[in-house]
């Protein structure tokens, strides 16, 4: 199977049969598990997060709670005790951020609400924590972010992030 974007899988293990997911130039091989893959083209990394069971990326076996991140240069880093709730928040109808920069926040908002985001003076260095329902209107999301110190101008479907 090949994906673009993000997907969540629950796979039952079958002897002598492997379930493989290709995302960009990487392949995740399932060994009977539940896992999330985030591989949007605009993200700097492909992230595979294990909810339960095990998967194999390259020659590394990942276990529940692990997250493998492969950057655009092909370097892989494995994080143990990953924030599974954050990784699968999208499938539970939420945006969840834990020390996320504005670019991380705005990439998700841009995809969900189909808006174009720009940073004419560069992205602010502020970090964001919290969860926002994906059922909130775009105006509601910006109101929440502005209460956290973010500044924007909005013209139609174009959002300009200000310092």
Language model features by range: what are they?
Residues 1-163:
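A residue-level detector for the "anchor" residue at the start of short, highly conserved motifs
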């Amino acid at each position: 199977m090949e994906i673009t974007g993000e997907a969540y899988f629950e796979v039952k293990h079958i002897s002598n049969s492997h379930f493989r997911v290709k995302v960009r130039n990487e392949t995740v091989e399932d060994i009977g598990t539940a896992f999330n893959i985030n591989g949007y083209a605009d993200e700097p990394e492909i992230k595979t997060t294990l909810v339960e069971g095990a998967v194999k990326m390259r020659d590394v076996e990942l276990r529940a709670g692990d997250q493998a991140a492969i950057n655009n240069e092909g370097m892989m880093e494995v994080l143990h005790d990953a924030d599974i709730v954050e990784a699968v928040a999208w499938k539970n109808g939420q945006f969840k951020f834990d020390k996320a920069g504005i670019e991380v926040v705005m990439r998700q908002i841009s995809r969900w609400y189909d808006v174009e985001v720009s940073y004419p003076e560069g992205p602010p260095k502020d970090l964001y924590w919290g969860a926002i329902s994906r059922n909130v209107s775009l105006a509601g999301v910006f109101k929440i972010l502005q209460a956290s110190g973010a500044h924007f101008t909005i013209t139609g479907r174009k959002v300009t992030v200000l310092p």
